[in-house]
């Protein structure tokens, strides 16, 4: 992806991608995905570039931390709850060639938000029985999201 502008979005409350990218204390960051989604839920404007960290290797990151777990609970009672992440990313779409969303292995509201905001899903799966069962549920969820929320969503591949 040399020469392309890439934004990584950590949608995991454990902040695994954030930590892997070198931010070892995600709970100390002033602005994270949780902050931005809370703004979207409250109809507050999100400024261009707000909450985006710049990595030395040339990719940008919207980090996550444990606050995202509480936000996921709040999403349940929110209007348009499936599209909050899409609202956050709409302002960034023009600035990037690729936006990659890293999801936790769960089918909660954050994953639904990621599928609603995505053009395509690339699904990593371990070659194990329980992973295969989880894949079956995820594929059913993708079909529902495609029917009800995001008809453009496609499965790019399963690894």
Predicted regions and their residues:
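P-loop NTP-binding core
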Residues: 1-159
């Amino acid at each position: 992806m040399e020469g392309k502008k890439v934004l990584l979005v950590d949608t995991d409350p454990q902040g695994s991608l954030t930590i892997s990218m070198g931010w070892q204390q995600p709970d100390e960051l002033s602005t994270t995905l949780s902050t931005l989604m809370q703004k979207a839920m409250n109809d507050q404007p999100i400024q261009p570039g707000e909450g985006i960290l710049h990595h030395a290797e040339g990719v940008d990151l919207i980090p996550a931390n444990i606050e995202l777990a509480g936000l996921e609970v709040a999403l349940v009672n929110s209007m348009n709850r499936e599209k909050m992440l899409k609202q956050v990313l709409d302002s960034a779409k023009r600035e990037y060639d690729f936006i990659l969303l890293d999801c936790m292995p769960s089918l909660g509201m954050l994953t639904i938000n990621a599928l609603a905001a995505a053009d395509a899903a690339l699904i990593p799966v371990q070659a194990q029985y329980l992973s295969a069962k989880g894949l079956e549920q995820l594929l059913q969820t993708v079909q529902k999201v495609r029917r009800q929320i995001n008809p453009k969503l496609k499965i790019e591949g399963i690894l």
